[in-house]
Amino acid sequence: ILCSKYKENELEIIGAQQKINSLTHPDLHFVFPVNTSSKVKSKATSKHFVKEWRDAIIENPYITLSQWLEKIEITNKKGNISVNEAEEINKIMSLKSYEGGYKVMVIWMAENMNTECANKLLKLIEEPSRETVFLLLTENKSAILPTIKSRCQEINIPPIDTKEIAESLIKKG
């Protein structure tokens, strides 16, 4: 979707794909559970941990929530997606696309969105601006607030076979 504006120019498509693969495309945004830590003392949001996120996902695309929280040294707290995050999402998604095409917001482990965050995102998710896509990823769809679920199109993706995961991890070393 982030390459769709480059219909004819193969070099631009390759450039966009490289940015996507390195998770650095300026129109690809990620939100994930965080909390305060030694690095961030208050109002923690995903933007404070974006480098660690990219590194973690590139290293292990199958990372679990507990592995993620351990990676960012949040051990005695629950990771969550807070109202502060909703404010960041609203800011980011109100801007024009950097490269002139789609904007994509991936919310990983969306079931960790607190009620205040969900309520603040309702209108944006229901009526996103043109060429805006939200992907809410969850392991527990029943934990997502019904008001959010009702505004989304559900696509079930079965879990990846553990054998495939093991083979992929072995290949990576």
Walk through the language-model features, giving the residues of each.
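Charged, glycine-rich active-site and insertion segments that engage polyanionic ligands
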Residues: 1-22, 130-133, 139-173
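Structural recognition of the conserved hydrophobic beta-strand(s) that form the central parallel beta-sheet
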Residues: 104-108, 121, 132-138
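Conserved catalytic/switch belt of AAA+ P-loop NTPases
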Residues: 94, 119-130
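Alpha-helix C-cap/termination motif
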Residues: 96-99, 127-128, 172
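Generic recognition of short, well-ordered alpha-helical segments
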Residues: 116-120, 147
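Conserved adenine-binding aromatic site and its adjacent loop/helix in ATP-hydrolyzing domains
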Residues: 91, 123, 150
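Clamp-loader machinery-focused feature within the broader ASCE/P-loop NTPase space
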Residues: 1-112, 116
